[in-house]
Each structure stands twice: as structure tokens, then as C-alpha cells.
């Protein structure tokens, strides 16, 4: 009986060791792109809501996916530009206006 339990634990341990590790798909350039858009434009939206946040995120994600940036500097610049474009396209009033 002890031999069965030992074999079972050994098999379980081996399956954990041999199973592929799960990695999060993290793109640091996308993070810079989004942070820049949020900091420079989204925070100035007069009316913020869950719906407006989701729409903004969807626009930014799609824009980035279609034409990703390749350096932190480029991502910061383009993130702010795309967020400004979104505000213009959607006729969103900013606090500075």
C-alpha cells in the first residue's frame, strides 16, 4: 500500500515537472502605449464611466494590434497621439477645453 502511494506521488510530481509552464502574454510596449494614452488624454475626459473605459481600451488595443510600436519612446508618443485621435473622433470633451 505504501508503495502505491509513493508511486502515485512520484507520478504526480513528475507530471508537474514535465508540464509546460504557463506564461502571461505581456507586452511592455503595449503597456507604455496605454499608459501614455491614459495619462495624457483619458484622465482629462469630463465624463468617465466603465463603458467609456472599455471603448477607449478597445480602440487603443485595436490600434496597437494593427500597428505595434517597437520602442518605449515611440510607444509613449503614439499612445498619446492615438488617445487624442480617439477623443476627437468620438467628440469627447476634455477638462482643459
UniProtKB/Swiss-Prot annotation:
Keyword tRNA processing: no
Outcome when changing residue 75 to S: Complete loss of lysis
Location(s), subcellular: Host periplasm
Leader peptide range in chain numbering: 1-24
Post-translational note: Disulfide bond is required for functionality.
InterPro entries hit by this protein: RI_T4
Source superkingdom: Viruses
Keywords recorded for this protein, A-Z: Cytolysis, Disulfide bond, DNA-binding, Host cell lysis by virus, Host periplasm, Signal, Viral release from host cell
Cystines in this chain: 69-75
Biological process according to GO: killing of cells of another organism
Record-level GO cellular component terms: host cell periplasmic space; host cell plasma membrane
One Pfam family named in its UniProt record: Antiholin
One example GO MF annotation: DNA binding
Keyword Signal part of the UniProt annotation: yes
Coiled-coil residue windows: none
Family statement drawn from the similarity comment of this UniProt entry: Belongs to the T4likevirus antiholin family.
Known partners and oligomeric status: Homotetramer; in free-form. Homomultimer. Heterotetramer composed of 2 holin and 2 antiholin. The holin-antiholin complex binds dsDNA. Interacts (via C-terminus) with holin (via C-terminus); this interaction blocks the holin homomultimerization and delays the host cell lysis.
Role, per record: Involved in lysis inhibition. Senses superinfections and inhibits the holin, thereby delaying the host cell lysis timing. The genomic DNA from the superinfecting phage bound to the complex holin-antiholin probably serves as a signal for the lysis inhibition and blocks the holin multimerization.
Protein name: Antiholin
Amino acid at each position: 500500500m505504501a508503495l502505491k502511494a509513493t508511486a502515485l506521488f512520484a507520478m504526480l510530481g513528475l507530471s508537474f515537472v514535465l508540464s509546460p509552464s504557463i506564461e502571461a502574454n505581456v507586452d511592455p510596449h503595449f503597456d507604455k502605449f496605454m499608459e501614455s494614452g491614459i495619462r495624457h488624454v483619458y484622465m482629462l475626459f469630463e465624463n468617465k464611466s466603465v463603458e467609456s473605459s472599455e471603448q477607449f481600451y478597445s480602440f487603443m488595443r485595436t490600434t496597437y494590434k494593427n500597428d505595434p510600436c517597437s520602442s518605449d519612446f515611440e510607444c509613449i508618443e503614439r499612445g498619446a497621439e492615438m488617445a487624442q485621435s480617439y477623443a476627437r473622433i468620438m467628440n469627447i470633451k476634455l477638462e482643459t477645453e
